[in-house]
């Protein structure tokens, strides 16, 4: 939206994507080189083994390369390091550097990288490593960043909250339930503070 897509265009983009593919690390056969294709055709099942160190552990179930590629396609023309305040509509997004526990607000840089970092849900997507930072979804520190919008000059804040309510103990059964609850709890105080700054909710 910030770079000129209309609401109708964004709706169409969302509805026409193959989300099963985007939210996987599968590489299309057409993108593989000849030797990779031959390996695929030779074996019904393959299990990769490698010497892996602690530093190489990815930190998430999904590397997110396919969705990052989509972001790159959608932001064609904005691949250089740019000032997000100079976009057709000023833009910012929030991540957390888990190396320091600090909030990182992107006002500049590569748009696709900022988008990918701000959606790196811990345990689901691998963190984004950038300039000695290890970045995850900003929802862990600021899931309703009204303060960021105010600092950018917003006069009226219209907020929409799509997060789930906290679950009672008998509903916290799966790993996903527990991770989701932790993320909601981590940003709860800042959320309450920002909620009071909202004009329409």
Show where each model-derived region lies:
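Patatin-like phospholipase
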Residues: 2-201
């Amino acid at each position: 939206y910030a770079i000129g897509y209309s609401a109708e265009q964004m709706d169409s983009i969302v509805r026409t994507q193959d989300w099963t593919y985007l939210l996987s690390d599968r590489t299309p056969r057409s993108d593989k080189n000849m030797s990779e294709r031959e390996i695929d055709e030779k074996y019904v099942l393959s299990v990769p083994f490698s010497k892996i160190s602690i530093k190489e552990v990815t930190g998430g179930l999904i590397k997110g390369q396919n969705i990052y590629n989509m972001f790159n396609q959608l932001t064609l023309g904005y691949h250089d390091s740019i000032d997000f305040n100079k976009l057709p509509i000023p833009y910012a997004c929030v991540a957390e550097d888990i190396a320091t526990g600090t909030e990182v607000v992107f006002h500049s840089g590569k748009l696709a990288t900022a988008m990918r970092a701000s959606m790196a849900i811990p345990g689901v997507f691998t963190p984004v490593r950038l300039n000695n930072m290890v970045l995850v979804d900003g929802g862990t520190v600021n899931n309703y960043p009204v303060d960021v919008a105010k600092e950018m000059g917003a006069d009226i804040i219209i907020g929409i909250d799509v997060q789930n309510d906290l679950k009672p103990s008998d509903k916290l059964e799966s790993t996903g339930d527990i991770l989701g609850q932790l993320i909601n709890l981590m940003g709860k105080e800042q959320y309450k503070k920002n909620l009071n700054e909202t004009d329409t909710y």
